Structure formats: structure tokens, C-alpha cells
Curated annotation (Swiss-Prot):
The active site is at S99, D219, H249. Keywords: Cytoplasm, Endoplasmic reticulum, Hydrolase, Lipid droplet, Membrane, Mitochondrion, Mitochondrion outer membrane, Phosphoprotein. This is Putative monoglyceride lipase. It comes from Schizosaccharomyces pombe (strain 972 / ATCC 24843) (Fission yeast). Coiled coil: none annotated. A motif (GXSXG) lies at residues 97-101. It catalyses: Hydrolyzes glycerol monoesters of long-chain fatty acids.
């Protein structure tokens, strides 16, 4: 396994409720949005992060090696290691992926070696297909696949513009100025990403973990219809799809105060799936246990912060390992003294840690008239 840069955000305000392994998107790195991880810490959620091979501080060889991953076969072993690294706790463990990372999270929930260790999967604007305006046709995809086998590390610019990432102009400018954020990647990573997404949709009936998918309606990078398709076909009976009107691609770094509403909604889902429960064996996947079936239904409702919410979820059976003894804490309103954040470049045998302190805005409770369309089918 290649050396991978890792950074763990464990400075929670009070008692930790859950732990998340976060997978960043294409062309990004985990230090690109520290305020997001700090906001999760404010909600008593620990976060373990890493720069994927070929990106950020895990990139080897400078800009000429941007997005050179070595191939799809190496990605899951990297993720196996990150999940094992984060499993040294009684806290329930969740896998949260954004964009390219969201597609990886869904695929790992289907066939990942350690998926039984997960209490649930959160796929944010997952890369299953490109937005219809940019989705390559069949012939172009076929050509890309063939050429990538001959010249896997040939660099290609996806031409994703920073202004399409979030409505927060200050964040867009910061991403544009960040030398480690780039729209360039290897032909191999593009080919793998597109082909993996198509196959993941086909395999949706084999997904049996608790599932939350979130997508912005104004995302013009990835296809929200594909997210909905995966949700509808997923084998799990514990699944929720949330659609946020007006949100761009990166929901976790959207403009304030709407981003706080978003994080509150996702945190509430994590809290709900962090409660201890009875278990029975799943017929579909005997290696995974799930809580005793329950059935509830709900109509579109308003969120606690007053933002109209349309949410669709279906929750009759949760097919994940029951979470450990962890009780949800209320969403804190302000920051407090915290444990140090650990940052390292890792190999499987060693984790080198140094203390860092991340400064970001606390996540206040929000009262706003903006809409957040979320669909709940229980």
C-alpha cells in the first residue's frame, strides 16, 4: 500500500456519538474544507480522513502525477486500511463519501471487505454518472477506456469550474487559489470513475447497509437522477434520499446558513443510526446483522430549524452491524476545549501523528426561510 496522508478530526465538543471515515471527491484533498470537519466535531462526530492516492498530499511526483492512482484495484485496499484504522473504538462507524468518493462509498457498501463494520453509508452527490450536459456518449467512453489502458497516466482536464462547486463565493475563491485542488486527472482515473459508476448502479440491489443519499438540485457536475435510481433499487430497506433545492455540487461547503441546516439533517440521521438496537440475521447477507424490523411512515415535514423539508426514506429493516453503546448528544451551539487533531502520512504499520488545530466557525442552530427539499419514505 502506498503512503497515504491522513488527518483525524477528533476534537468533539462533548462526548463523541459516532465516527465517520470521509472520502473526498475528484481533484480535492481533505485540508480543502476544514470548516466542514470542525462542524461535524461541533456535532460530536469524530472524522477520520485521508487524501486518496494521486490527490493532495498523497500525490507522488508533483503536478505531473495529479490523479495518477495506479488503478481501481488499489482503491479498495486503501479504503480497507482506513476503515480498520478507524475501527479501534466502540463508536458506530459510518462511511461518508463526496462525489467520486460518494461513488466509492456506495460500491464499498456492496462489496467492501470490511463493510460489516459500518453502521451506515452516506453518499453525497455520488459520482454514478456525470450531469446529462457533460456525460460522454457511448463511443467516447469506449475510446476513453481503450486509450486509458495504453496511456493510463496521460493527463486530462475535466474543466470543472470552481463556481459550480458551491454558492459560497469565498469558498470558491479559496478552492481556485489552492494549489492542491485541480480539475486535472489521469485518463485511468476518469475511465475507472465512469465505468465504476455505471456498474455500481447495476449492483444497487446488492446494497444492504443503512443508506443516506443527498444531492443538490442545481448540481451540474454529477447526475441527481442516477442517485435517485440507486436509492430506489438499493436492496436495503433502511434508506433515505434527501434532495436540496438550489444547492450546488458540494453540499457540505454550501453557503451559510443553509449549510448548517444540511449538516444538522445528516447529523440527525447519524444520531438515529447510532442508537443500540436488537439484531437478527439478514437473509441476503449472513455476515451482517441488522436491527429488529420496524415500520414507520411520514409525510413531508418541516425541519427543527424551520426550513421546509421534503424527505423520502424507507425504513423497515436496517441491515448493518448494530452500533455500539453510543447515545446521541444535542447539536452544540458553540466550540469548546478540544483534543488535538492528528495529522499524518501513513503506511499500514505506522501512523505518525502531529498536533494541529483547525479554526472554523461554530455551527449554530439556524432559522432560515430557505428551502431544503428532502424526500422521506419510511
Amino acid at each position: 500500500m502506498a503512503d497515504l496522508y491522513t488527518k483525524d478530526w477528533t476534537d468533539v465538543k462533548d462526548k463523541p456519538v459516532a465516527r465517520v471515515v470521509f472520502i473526498h471527491g475528484f481533484g480535492e484533498h481533505v485540508n480543502a474544507y476544514p470548516e466542514f470537519f470542525e462542524a461535524l466535531n461541533e456535532r460530536n462526530i469524530e472524522v477520520y480522513t485521508f487524501d486518496q492516492r494521486g490527490f493532495g498530499h498523497s500525490r507522488k511526483g508533483g503536478p505531473k502525477k495529479q490523479g495518477c492512482t495506479g488503478g481501481w484495484s488499489l482503491v479498495f485496499p486503501d479504503l480497507d486500511y482506513q476503515i480498520l484504522r478507524a475501527s479501534d473504538t466502540e463508536l458506530p462507524l459510518f462511511l461518508w463519501g463526496h462525489s467520486m468518493g460518494g461513488g466509492l462509498a456506495l460500491r464499498y457498501g456492496i462489496s467492501g471487505t470490511h463493510r460489516h463494520k459500518l453502521a451506515g453509508v452516506i453518499a453525497q452527490a455520488p459520482m454514478l454518472r456525470c450531469h446529462p450536459d457533460t456525460e460522454p456518449n457511448f463511443l467516447l467512453r469506449k475510446a476513453l477506456t481503450l486509450v486509458s489502458k495504453v496511456h493510463p497516466n496521460f493527463l486530462f482536464d475535466s474543466d470543472v469550474q470552481s463556481q459550480h462547486i458551491t454558492r459560497d463565493e469565498a469558498v470558491n475563491q479559496r478552492l481556485q487559489d489552492d494549489p492542491l485542488v485541480s480539475s486535472v486527472g489521469s485518463l485511468q482515473v476518469f475511465s475507472d470513475m465512469l465505468n465504476r459508476g455505471t456498474k455500481t448502479i447495476e449492483l444497487a440491489p446488492q446494497f444492504f447497509l443503512p443508506l443516506l443519499i443527498t444531492h443538490g438540485t442545481d448540481d451540474n457536475v454529477t447526475c441527481s437522477d442516477s442517485s435517485k435510481e440507486f436509492y430506489e433499487n438499493a436492496g436495503t430497506k433502511d434508506k433515505t434520499y434527501q434532495s436540496y433545492p438550489g444547492f450546488y455540487h458540494s453540499l457540505h461547503i454550501e453557503k451559510k446558513p443553509e449549510v448548517y441546516e444540511y449538516l444538522d439533517k445528516v447529523a440527525a440521521w447519524i444520531y438515529e443510526h447510532s442508537k443500540p438496537s436488537e439484531t437478527v440475521k439478514s437473509e441476503q447477507e449472513t455476515a451482517v446483522e441488522h436491527p429488529k424490523p420496524t415500520a414507520t411512515t411520514s409525510a413531508p415535514s418541516a425541519s427543527p430549524t424551520g426550513v421546509p423539508v421534503e424527505e423520502e426514506s424507507h425504513k423497515a429493516t436496517s441491515d448493518a452491524v448494530p452500533p455500539a453503546e453510543a447515545k446521541p448528544e444535542p447539536v452544540p451551539a458553540s466550540a469548546a476545549e478540544r483534543a488535538p487533531t492528528s495529522e499524518s502520512t501513513t503506511v499500514p504499520e505506522t501512523i505518525v501523528a502531529s498536533t494541529t488545530k483547525v479554526i472554523s466557525e461554530p455551527a449554530p442552530r439556524v432559522t432560515t426561510a430557505a428551502t431544503a427539499d428532502i424526500v422521506t419514505n419510511k
